């Protein structure tokens, strides 16, 4: 796979190690950023909130310790991202789930921290960082292909015949490999044969949607570059078409279409949820606990598959406006002065690819993708940016805001790491963690393992758990059954089913309970009525557009 790495490419490796007076000032910072990018990539792309918070704090911290005198010359570029974090905090305290909501602020903190880094100094060498990133692209793509064929069971890198690589999620891995292809294509140090390495990795992910977006992004790149590469584009398009035909013959194309329809339904349900609290949102991460009440079809989704709607739900319409303002203003700056910006064609193509895929997937949950997006958008922070969109801040105010953000992210990092510890040991923790569904669930699970069923019921009642947290309610119901309080358990379970008629997992759990403990005649009549209502609902659009909807036969229960 290294056959395409020619002599020029090998000599180009010295680009990472040479002494250059122009970049020597920030060489240490940029080396640190490259190492951090590689570390986040290996750690599941920063999907874990604790890892994302630690990386965000580290990004801000290196600005302070690496430069005794720094100036945030373009802090106005960070205002919108800072607003996202503060709006998320307000939403978290107003209608969230304690530390659970705070943990879901990690992506927004990564946006803010990385933006601070790329606007903290005026002599930041973008070319140096991109030069190192190219080798990360090539090495990570080659390693992913090797693991796919040699060690397919390595840490979940391959699942159901699809390459998930470092993200353990095939679609986001496909986005990374598509960006890697464009990044290598934009480099004079790599040949078109070298570009085959990330392209093969992209094909192995079997992500049809990303493959189509990749062709679109490649077309944008070639148009902006004004390069006559019609045969090259045709070859890439042909290979993507072959992938689509193969997926169609294997039957997975039908599954992909069904998945796309399901995500459209999720967006519809998410908009209904957002309508209940449009200005401050429903709280970061609250989608997982709330969507069962509004779902229009039978699906299970802990995270909504639309990045923009996720921001709307987490922080309200103002948070979404702040994010879109940041992206749009940076894109305007890049387009306006793209002739003066190195790698502007790749930057535009990469940004478009990521922002389009945000519409139908969860890429925004990965700190690595967030960092890349801000890195590319920060090309609009140069001294030739649109002056009409700029307004000054005294440097003492900029530094004060930086230290304030550093303190907030440090606090969130501490809370999230302590929360992870409580989940691991199954402890209840201080009272401020009682509203956290995951902390409480593991605490109640530990009580169940110890046979303290009465304590589980008392704890559930004393915490006044929200009815939508079905996992916690099921622990209470199971404890009631174990205490031989079948009537109370049956009543709680039927109420939960009635509220969540399209919760497939809940139906399966209820079936197991009723098969084992039995059900009263009154309960059977009520259950049959719920079944009829559920069947009528899933036979109507939009649920009827999905083939995986299940009609339950409750009358067969013993």
Could you describe each region identified by the protein language model?
Residues 142, 146-151, 202, 210, ...:
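A membrane-periplasm/extracellular boundary helix in multi-pass inner-membrane enzymes
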Residues 1-135, 183, 187-192, 219-234, ...:
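Transmembrane signal-anchor hairpin modules in multi-pass inner-membrane enzymes, especially those
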Residues 308:
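Short active-site alpha-helical segment characteristic of glycosyltransferases
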Residues 30-42, 53-63, 85-92, 103-117, ...:
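Alpha-helical transmembrane segments of multi-pass inner-membrane proteins
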Residues 169, 263, 366:
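Short, conserved phosphate/pyrophosphate- and ester-handling motifs at nucleotide-, phospho-/glycolipid
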Residues 264-302, 311, 315-321:
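TM-adjacent membrane-interface loops and short helices in multi-pass inner/ER membrane proteins
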């Amino acid at each position: 796979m290294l056959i395409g790495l020619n002599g020029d490419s090998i000599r180009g490796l010295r680009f990472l190690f040479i002494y250059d007076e122009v970049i020597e000032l920030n060489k240490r910072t940029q080396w640190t950023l490259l190492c951090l990018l590689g570390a986040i990539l290996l750690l599941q792309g920063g999907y874990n909130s604790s890892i994302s918070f630690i990386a965000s704090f580290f990004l801000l911290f290196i600005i302070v310790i690496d430069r005794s005198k720094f100036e945030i010359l373009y802090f106005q570029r960070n205002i919108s991202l800072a607003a996202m974090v503060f709006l998320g905090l307000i939403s978290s305290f107003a209608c969230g789930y304690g530390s659970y909501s705070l943990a879901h602020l990690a992506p927004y903190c990564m946006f803010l921290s990385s933006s601070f880094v790329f606007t903290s100094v005026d002599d930041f060498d973008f070319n140096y960082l991109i030069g190192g990133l190219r080798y990360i692209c090539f090495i990570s793509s080659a390693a992913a292909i090797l693991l796919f064929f040699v060690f397919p069971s390595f840490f979940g890198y391959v699942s159901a015949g699809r390459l998930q690589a470092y993200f353990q999620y095939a679609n986001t891995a496909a986005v990374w490999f598509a960006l890697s292809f464009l990044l290598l294509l934009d480099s004079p140090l790599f040949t078109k044969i070298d570009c085959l390495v990330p392209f093969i990795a992209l094909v192995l992910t079997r992500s049809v949607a990303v493959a189509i977006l990749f062709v679109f992004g490649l077309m944008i790149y070639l148009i902006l570059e004004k390069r006559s590469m019609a045969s090259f584009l045709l070859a890439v398009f042909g290979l993507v078409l072959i992938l689509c035909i193969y997926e169609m013959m294997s039957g997975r194309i039908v599954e992909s279409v069904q998945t796309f329809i399901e995500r459209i339904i999720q967006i519809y349900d998410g908009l209904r949820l957002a309508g209940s609290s449009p200005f401050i949102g429903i709280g970061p991460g609250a989608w997982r606990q709330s969507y069962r009440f509004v779902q229009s079809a039978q699906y299970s989704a802990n995270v909504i598959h639309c990045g923009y709607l996720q921001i709307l739900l987490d922080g309200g319409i103002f948070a979404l406006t702040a994010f879109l303002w940041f992206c749009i203003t940076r894109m305007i700056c890049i387009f306006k002065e793209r002739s003066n910006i190195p790698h502007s064609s790749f930057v535009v193509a990469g940004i478009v690819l990521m922002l389009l895929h945000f519409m139908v997937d969860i890429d925004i949950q990965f700190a690595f993708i967030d960092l890349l997006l801000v890195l590319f958008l920060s090309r609009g922070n140069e001294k030739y940016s649109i002056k009409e969109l700029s307004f000054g801040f005294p440097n003492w105010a900029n530094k004060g805001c930086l230290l304030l953000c550093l303190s907030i992210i440090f606090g969130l990092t501490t809370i999230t790491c302590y929360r992870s510890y409580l989940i691991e040991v199954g402890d209840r923790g201080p009272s401020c963690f009682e509203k956290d569904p995951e902390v409480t669930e593991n605490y109640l699970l530990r009580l169940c393992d110890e046979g303290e069923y009465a304590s589980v019921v008392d704890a559930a009642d004393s915490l006044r758990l929200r009815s939508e947290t079905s996992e916690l309610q099921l622990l209470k119901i199971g404890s009631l059954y174990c205490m031989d309080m079948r009537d109370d358990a049956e009543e709680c379970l039927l109420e939960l089913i009635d509220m969540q008629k399209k919760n497939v997992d809940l139906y399966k759990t209820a079936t197991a309970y009723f098969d084992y403990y039995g059900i009263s005649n009154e309960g059977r009549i009520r259950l049959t009525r719920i079944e009829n209502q559920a069947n009528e609902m899933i036979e109507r659009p939009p649920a009827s557009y999905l083939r995986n909807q299940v009609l339950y036969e409750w009358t067969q229960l013993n």
